[in-house]
Amino acid sequence: MINGKFKSRFAKQFAIGLGVALAASTFAVPVSGAKQAPSAAAKNDLTIMIGEPNGGWCNQDSPGVDQIAAKNSVFETLTILNSDNKIVPYLAKSVTGSNENKTWTITLREGILFHDGEELTAATVQMNLMANLGIIKPFTGKGQAASLPAIAWQGIMPTASPAQWAANVKIISKYVLEVNLGVKRPNFPYTLWNVGRPTILSTKTLQDPNCGNTMGAGTGPFMISSKGVDQFTTVLKANPNYWRSTPANKLPKASTVTFKVVGDAAQRVNALRKGQADIASFGATSGQQLNLLKTLKDKITLIEGPRETTWSFHLNATALPFANKDAREAFAQAFDTDSYTKLMTKGNGSPAYQLAVKEHPYYQPKGTLKFDLAKAKASVAKYTATTGKSLDVVVPINTTAESLKGAQALCKMMEAAGMKCTIMSPVTSQQYILRGFGLQQQMSLFNVVAGRSAEFANLFSTKTNLELSGFRFVNPGLAKCFADAAEVDTRKAYSTCVLELQAQSYWVPGYVEGGFLAWTNTTKGIGTTPLPGGGVRPIIGASGFDVASVTKG
């Protein structure tokens, strides 16, 4: 549960950041006024094209997947996910749990320097945890106010006073600190990575009002040269003191990295073909362009990351029509995930028959309603008989062409089942998210179930103001079920909750996707790279790729 004094400002600040994280990670972002992309620069200068506009990189910001990849080139995490899907220490040398996983001891690697010369110590991490909790500004008078990360961190380590803070995070020695949680968290090392979000920043960066906007010092392979001045261009330069660099393998390989924002996927493909970009990222709904890239194997390499992100429709259960179970079932039975996925991804996504992929703790193979037009019509008739109203569906959209295309397809399905369906006027992703959290629209299409951990999804299925279906009001026992299950964090623990979520059709699965990365044949070094904590880093993952090893040749 969220502390009341934080709650009112969380939803707004969270939505501002998360509008990109949840919407733009898949749907192309239209960019007007973007400058013409320059030709990819000299041998050691990389140009990477992404679809997501500039976003904040500080602790309380919520960038989307493209910006996370850029951010992780500058700032790094205490732990990281390897290619075996295991969380291993990264900036940390070890992370050890005790006291039923309520107490965690973090031991840091020694000698790691931030870009501004500060050494990574327990005191630095303590300050970062204060920033993660959203208490750095009220406690020190400097830094960011609370937003999404604070919701997550306050949920596991409530901290409202200096006395609580002193008890929660203790410095044991220069490189060792102890973190005391308010609940059991067996997956706390994942929380320290959390898809590349909780990065570690220098103390001066955390206290600077421009933290993550125009400045920032991290421990990563690249340093900020220019950010936030041109919303479509971020320029990074090599860190000469990078901690992973060795005499035998000097890192980073590139001298500079320029991230260029180009919202149109077709333009990103064209830039790769013309040598105006070395690397570009894509979402599954850029299906036509992805299929084109597959025909250019002699010039361009295309790889898909793990297909583990499930997009679902969160139906607002606090008001008609979806306060009525018959209406929710009619929607679920009328939705044809096979045809929807084929239309939207052109073979680059998968139909979603459950709320999560098999590797996710929320996965339950039974319980979701499947496409059945006859049953959908029967549910519509039952709704009308019960309420005396026609079943009128209103679909919200953002400003992208893909969003409109998806809504039009959805309306055709609903109308085939006997419902009336209209599409709302387009709004920005930020406005879409704000309305969703305010339960001011009938449904919200979100990708909250991703990867192989329940940590992020739990924010949207427990009693927080981020829960998009409003079942925390109409079915509070379900929200408590998820909160209790999180303390065990196993599929078995979540099973009762997920089966109820599916049985009530609060969430209706849409489609599954993975991220795509493409690079020219003159770009070298993209691949799995060794991790100091064990295993190798995936070629592409939820937090991007190892840009430190990339160059041209």
Regions found by a protein language model. Give the residues of each.
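Detector for C-terminal structural segments
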Residues: F232, A334-Y362, A401-C411, Q430-G553
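A structural "hinge/loop" feature
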Residues: G51-K71, L91-K93, E118, V183, ...
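Structural transition elements
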Residues: F222, S350-Y383, I397-K405
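Aromatic- and charge-enriched surface segment that lines or borders ligand/interaction sites
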Residues: K93-A145, E178, P321-A323
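Surface-exposed binding/hinge segments that line
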Residues: T107, K142-T203, G228
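Ligand-site clamp/hinge motif
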Residues: N210-A217, Y242-L292, K420
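N-terminal lobe/hinge region of extracytoplasmic solute-binding protein
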Residues: M49-N99, M130, A217
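Gly/Pro-rich hinge or "lid" segments in bacterial periplasmic/extracellular proteins
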Residues: K184-P252, T256
